[in-house]
Structure formats: C-alpha cells, structure tokens
Amino acid sequence: LLSAEGMDQLLCAIRARVNLEPDAEITMEANPGSVEAEKFAGFAKAGINRVSLGIQSFQDAQLKALGRIHNGEEAKHAIAIALQHFKSVNLDLMFGLPNQSLEAARSDMEIALSFKTPHLSFYNLTLEPNTYFASFPPKLPSEDEIDAIFEQNLKLLEAAGYRRYEVSAYAKKDQECKHNLNYWRFGDYIGIGAGAHGKISFPDKITRQVRERHPETYMQAMETKGNALIEAREISAKDLPFEFMLNTLRLTDGVDTVTFEERTGLPLNVVSKGLDEASKKGLLDPNPNKLKATEQGLRYLNNLQELFL
C-alpha cells in the first residue's frame, strides 16, 4: 500500500493540476490488516476523506477459506481506527461463502452494523473464471439458503437505517458513494496510473481506455511517450444499449428515460423490444419515464440485463 507521504505527494500533484470541488469525495481502498490500519491517520492528513475496507467476514474460518491475510479481530481494529480518522467509511461484506450458515451470516452483519458506518456493501460471492475457487469449487450454500441469508440481512440493514440504493450497496441518508453513482449512471471517468481504466465520451463516440498494467512499464511509457495507453476501444452503437443497461439497472431508483439518449446518443426506441419483454416478465417498472428494475428485476438482474444484448 502506498505510504502516507506518497499519498500526500500524489494528492498535491492532482490538486496542482485539477480544480477539485471543496467537498470532493477522495476514497482509498484498504485491507484491514493492522499495519495498514495504523497508517490511517497519515492518509487522512494527506486528504483522504473516505475509506473502503475489504472486511468480507468477521469469521476467521471464512477469511482463511477466502485466502485473506487478516482475521476477525484485525478487521474490527481497522474499522475502529478508520472511524476515528475518516469522514466516511464503507465496509465490504460477502455472503454465500463456503459452508456459511444463516447464523454465521447474521453474526457478520450484526458485528458490521454495530460500528454504525455510513455505508455498507453486501456482495454475493461469485466464482470468477481463472481463479482458485473456479478450478476447485468449494461447497457453497444452496440457492434457497443464499436467498434466506440475503432476506435476513436485508431486514437487519433496513432496521438499522440503511437504504439499498444499488443492487449491492447500502447507505445512511446522503451517504451514497459518489464515484460509484457516476459509474452506475454511465458517467465518464478518467483512469490514471498503472492498470487504470477510463470511459470518455466524445461528440461522436464513447471509448473505453486501459493503461499499462505493470507500474514499471507504465512509468517507462509515460517518460518516453507521455502516454501509457494500451487500449482505446470505441463502444459500438450495437453494444451501447447493453453497456448502459448493465450499469443503470443496478440502481434501485433507476434513471430517467431521457438519460438513455443523453448518455448514449441513441433514441430510446432502439431498446423497445427489450423494454417490452422486461415489462411482460415483471422485471421492469411500468413507469414510462423511468428505466428501473422491479424487486424481481433486481433479484434476477443478470436475466434482465441480458434482454438488452
């Protein structure tokens, strides 16, 4: 992890080049190991005002199964220190973990809620291709068990004053994550640094960009060419509707229908077939001025999004 001094230099360099808003959200992601937690005071002094902690679970056996280097007590320690130094703190929790019981999932959520952080992300474990779990699948809870875990913990979140504003994101009033809202509204963002991705809209096209992934290669490219791009792909008109829906349908409030044309440059009728089918299946809200998933649509989000392929 970058040192506090390095973070200070980085943010000073950004401020010297970009006119940041006074209330700009400046987020850092961190693992809850004790060494990193002790650095939080320095990061806050450098200008970080929001930290996202990859807790995943407070159960030592679950953390070990996930290959995490921290344990439950270190996670609690990191949260306590983060709350002392940062305006906003997010906790990442996972469910549907190997051999996870309803009781263990409830315990994880109750511990997380006891810290009263402004924001909480609650993800279902997915087995990504080319990972250890994909090659050697563990025993996971059944679909019914996963549904029970989700419904149980959703009630706990709502009772604690959190609102679900995205399929996996929950926040106290006015504590939604600004940069993630921008992604989910199909907004633009600049990728700076090794491995960074960006999305940029031009008057006649929208491109996705990728930078050199290895830090040393990235720095060499910047020094010799002033540019470390390894890919700048234009999103085709055929793919734009799906990419838009892939992001915006994650939001529980959805977006206004006019946003589709504003962000894609395409008329809404190019997705009329998908909209009709989604409405018939009860996956899309019938409000003609909104593109918004129903509760059923959020539950079967992949099925809803695939209608726009």
Regions found by a protein language model. Name each.
Residues 290-294:
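Minor-groove-contacting beta-hairpin "wing" of winged helix-turn-helix DNA-binding domains
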Residues 279-289:
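A short, conserved structural fragment
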Residues 265-277:
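Short amphipathic alpha-helical interaction segments
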Residues 296-309:
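Short, amphipathic alpha-helical interaction segments positioned at domain boundaries
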Residues 185, 280, 295:
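Short, ordered coil/turn segments that flank beta-strands lining enzyme active or ligand-binding pockets
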Residues 1-266:
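C-terminal scaffold of the Radical SAM
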Residues 110, 272, 281, 298-301:
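Generic N-terminal initiation segments characterized by hydrophobic and/or small/turn-forming residues
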